[in-house]
Structures are given as structure tokens and as C-alpha cells.
Amino acid sequence: YRQTMKTICYIIPYFGKLPKNFQIYLLSCAQNPTVNWKILTDDRTPYEFPTNVHVQYCNYEEVKQRIKAWFDFETVIDRPWRLSLFKPAYGEIFAEELSGYDFWGHCDIDLMWGNIRTFYSENNLNKYERLGFLGHSTLYKNTPEVNARYKRIVPGEINYKDVFSGRSNYSF
């Protein structure tokens, strides 16, 4: 009896020119064939995408409108970098793209991946609902409860509505 490996997908909206070292980043993704990446971008540079990296060509305005439509209050997404403030909500916003995965995550695209499964082992994936917290690589268990946790209000603390509707740069 062999337990099925938990599925992982990182979602990365990125608009504008991808970094110079992006092809190297893709090579490091290719070294992790049991992990998928979904990149939403308007950069049509003909990179050699490995089979586990899926590109959805779209523009910043489309993703911005998708995010704005998700919330019942005014959000501020006046520059592409502000998309990063919404990372904890990607599990809900991009639920269609993440459907069927056990875990979803967000990550930076200037990482050079080693063997992801060494740290994100089956033992850790079975034990935790969130792994990582600094944003360069964070995974969340793909369940409605976990995907909605960013909405928890902690009295006296800045909450998601403050972050998503404010003009300051936050992290939470």
C-alpha cells in the first residue's frame, strides 16, 4: 500500500517583463516534476516552459477586475505590485485554477528551487495546514476553511479589509 502523494500548485500572477533569470527559475521548477506552477502573465517571451509550469496569458486589468469582483468592498489595486497584498486570498480568488490540488501556494519568482519535497514532505503536508509564512514560498491546504482564514478578524489588529482597501503596503 502506497499513499498517494499530495498535490501542490503555486499560483503566480505577474505582469510586465519577467526577470532576466526567469529561464533559470523555470529550470529549477522542472527539477520538481511533482509540483505544478500556474503563471498568469502578459509577458509572451518564448521561454521554454517545463511540463509542470502552465501559463495563462492575460493582462493586469483582467486579473485586477477579477479580484475587485470577488470582494463586496472597494479594493485598491492601482499598481501590479499591489497584487502581492492579496496573496493570502488567492485560494478563493483563483479557486478554479487551483481546483483538484491538495495544497496551493504563492511564491516569488527569483527563487532557485531545490527539491521542494524535502521540506514539504508528506509528513509535513499531513501535519500542517500552512507551511511557510514570509511570502517567498507559502503553502496552504486547499480547503474552504483554510482558504478563508485571511478573513479572520483579530480585535485591535489590521485586517484584510484594511489591507485590501488601503493605500499603504502591508504584510499579514
Where are these regions (language model features)?
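N-proximal low-complexity "stem/linker" segments adjacent to membrane-targeting elements
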Residues: 1-23
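A structural signal for isolated positions on well-ordered beta-strands in alpha/beta enzyme cores
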Residues: 9-11, 36-38, 54
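Short, acidic, metal-binding catalytic loop of nucleotide-sugar glycosyltransferases
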Residues: 24-36
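Short, polar loop motifs at secondary-structure junctions
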Residues: 40-46
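Active-site-proximal specificity loops/subdomain of glycosyltransferases
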Residues: 46-97
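GT-A fold catalytic core of metal-dependent nucleotide-sugar glycosyltransferases
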Residues: 85-132
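Short beta-strand-to-loop element that shapes/binds the nucleotide-sugar donor at the catalytic cleft/hinge
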Residues: 128-145
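Catalytic core and acceptor-binding pocket of nucleotide-sugar-dependent glycosyltransferases
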Residues: 148-172
